[in-house]
Structure formats: C-alpha cells, structure tokens
Amino acid sequence: MTVYHFVGIKGTGMSSLAQILHDMKNTVQGSDYEKRFFTQVALEKRGISILPFDKNNIKEGQVIIAGNAFPDTHEEIMAAKELNIPVHRYHHFLGNLMSQYTSVAVTGAHGKTSTTGLLAHVMQGANPTSYLIGDGTGHGVENSKYFAFEACEYRRHFLSYYPDYAIMTNIDFDHPDYFADINDVFHAFQEMALQVKKGIIACGDDEELQKIQAKVPVIFYGFGEDNDFQARNIQKRTDGTVFDVFVRNTYYETFKITGYGNHSVLNALAVIALCHYENIDVEVVKHQLTTFEGVKRRFNEKTVRDQVIIDDYAHHPTEINATIEAAHQKYPEREIIAIFQPHTFSRTETFLDEFAESLSKADQVYLCDIFGSARENKGELTIEDLQKRIDGAELITDTTTDILKKHKNGVLIFMGAGDIQKFEAAYIKEVQVAEK
C-alpha cells in the first residue's frame, strides 16, 4: 500500500493537498515543526498523523511530497535521496494530479480564495468536484469530474500548472519583494495564459487583463458594457446582493448571492460565466450561489455583546477597500471600525499612501505594529509613518484592545495577513472578563 508522506504538511497548500489525497482513500501522513498551526484542525479531524521532522520518517515505498519552503538539504529530503525515493515538489505533484480532471485554476492578485471556494461549491451541485483552496481547505472525491484550485502568482508558482480553464480575477501590483512593477506581474499572467488549454474567464473591467493574449477563447466578465458577461441592475441589500446577468447584451438570468460589495458580484460573475461555458444547469448555479457560506478569514463574522466582529485576510489596499465597502453595505447605519496590521515592511512602504486612502473609508482606524516577514529587513519604516497619513488613527497593541469597547453597536473589522487574530482574541477575552 502506498503511503504519501508530506514534508511540511502544515503549509496551507500542503495541508489542502494532503486532505484531498486522504479523501480519495489514500494513506497520508506528514511531518512539520511542532508549533501549532491553524491547518492542523482539518488534518486532525481526518486522523492524518502529523510527526516531528525526523529522517527516520522516510521509508521505502513512500511517495514523498515536499513543501517549497524546505531546501534539498532538509534531513527528510536527504534521507529520501539516500533511499533513491523520488521527491515531488508540491506544485509539480499538484500539476500532475489535476491533469486527471477538468481543471480550473483561479488566479488573480485579489479574490482567489473566495472565488475558488464559490466555484467549488457551485460546481459540486452539478458534478463531483475536488478542490484546493489557499486557506488550507482541501476536499477530494474519487470520481471527480472537476478539480478547482487556487493558483498563486507569487514567485510565478502558477507556471507549474497547465489547466483546462483559468479564471483571472484581476492583475495588480503586490508582492513588491518579488515583482518589480505592474509590468512584471502582467508578464507572469501572460505566460500563464499561454498554458491554459480550453478557455480563460477574465475580468474585462481590469485594464491589464484586457491586454492578455491567449491561444484559447478569452471570455470577459464585469460591469462594463463591452464584457461578454455583464452584471446589471445591481441591488445592494443588507441580506446580500441581487443582479441581472446579460450575455453579449441579451438578458440571461437574475441571481442572488450571499456576499456584499462589488467584488462579490464580480467573483460570482466569473463562476456564472465558467458554468455557462461548461453547460451547467443555470437552476443549479442559482441555488448553489444562495447557499454559499464563505471561506476562512474572508469577512467571517461573529457577534460579541452589541458589536459585530469581522475577521478578514485583507492586506493590500484594494482588498481593504472591498472589505470596508462590504461592511458599509451590510451595516449601513453602524459605525465601521478598522483594526489593521500591515503585513511586511516592503508592502507597507510600497503602498503607504494607498493604505492610508483605503483605511480612511472606515469611520475610525486603529493600527497594529507592522508584521515583518522572515525574508526581509525592517528598514527605516515604522507604523507611525502610516498613522500620520490617516486622520484620527490610533495605535493599538494586544494589551490595549479595551479601547475598542467605546464603539457601542460598532462593526469591528480585524484585517491583516499576519497574526491580527491574536488582537481579536485579546479583545474578545477582554470583553468576556468584563462581563464576569
């Protein structure tokens, strides 16, 4: 019996892939650092064993899958080589796996995770679908027709894939530690477009995506009239969003979604366009759109006393705009408070003015210290450089969150890609202690 061993199983992509292989009735195990990580929950629920790193974990007959963070000199990878066991890097293994299905890569600077989750949910209503989401969620079905997966542009990782379809949500300058500028990002997406085998579903409202050249049909979606799939007559309600879809200027159908903000409409439109292209029954699509419950760390809400607390992964100005817009739509009468932790010094420095502009759309802003990456130096930048660009912004630590209690009936959005959740946890604990 083949045993799949993951070197670095707690990585978000790695844990998702491990879940998929397990669900497909394979024997799966893995190793990693002993520090607890949020991806462990899904692995433990499935009974997948997580071991400490040890060269003795490697045995004859295993299939070794290694995360990109671990060099060839890692003790387990070295042990595999000594036993002449091939080591498959995560992206290459995933690329081979998806070739067995009708694969859909979801790419873009923003909206990948939410769109992948929505796509998988909708397609599941019509046909067996396996999926891999960048939030550490994976689901495998043995007789899958479709394989939906999130494909990240960072370090051009997505060039390991040759999918049947690609959804391209947008092209934006991010990851300034790797990409030189927007043109560098565009060229990565252009290279990806040439690897797609059947069709590309791209947001036509995005100026960069309009320039994409491909060997396959490119179907454009968006709000603009030139798009193949256009959303019109949008009703932004407190219980979701309703809109009409026109296909090449002819009315197609009216859809209701559970999401808020323009970005949620665009994500749904991409999914609707792909399903139309694959001849999935529109009634199935309509029903599945109304039952989608979202993905991890994307506008996740809870109520604490008279306040709404939202946990969101937004860490780029475009994403912050979208999250604050969604909060204003759902809670039009309430004060919106942004608690933001910048992620990496390089990104904060590159987008300093843009961060200030997007955060200013909240009624009140609190800033946590910058969450540095292990890959970078601090440089001269401090959180005060951002604070002075936002009127009334205050600094906050995980020991001073009690200041948030004064926002009676407020909507508190904790945003960031670092450890912003510890600030949220500290505040909730503060409120619970005060209640006793």
Curated annotation (Swiss-Prot):
From the Swiss-Prot or TrEMBL record, state where the protein is found: Cytoplasm
- Report the pathway entry: Cell wall biogenesis; peptidoglycan biosynthesis
Keywords from UniProt, A to Z, are: ATP-binding, Cell cycle, Cell division, Cell shape, Cell wall biogenesis/degradation, Cytoplasm, Ligase, Nucleotide-binding, Peptidoglycan synthesis
Which EC numbers does the record give?
6.3.2.8
Q: What class of enzyme is it?
A: ligase
Pfam families per record: Mur_ligase, Mur_ligase_C, Mur_ligase_M
Q: Where does ATP bind?
A: 108-114
- GO BP terms: cell division; cell wall organization; peptidoglycan biosynthetic process; regulation of cell shape
Q: What is its main location?
A: cytoplasm
Q: Which GO terms describe its cellular component?
A: cytoplasm
Q: A single GO molecular function, which one?
A: ATP binding
Reactions listed under catalytic activity: UDP-N-acetyl-alpha-D-muramate + L-alanine + ATP = UDP-N-acetyl-alpha-D-muramoyl-L-alanine + ADP + phosphate + H(+)
Q: Which family does it belong to?
A: Belongs to the MurCDEF family.
User: What does this protein's UniProt record list under function?
Assistant: Cell wall formation.
**NCBIfam families under this entry?**
murC (TIGR01082)
What's the protein here called? Answer: UDP-N-acetylmuramate--L-alanine ligase
Task: Write the lineage as a comma-separated list.
Answer: Bacteria, Bacillati, Bacillota, Bacilli, Bacillales
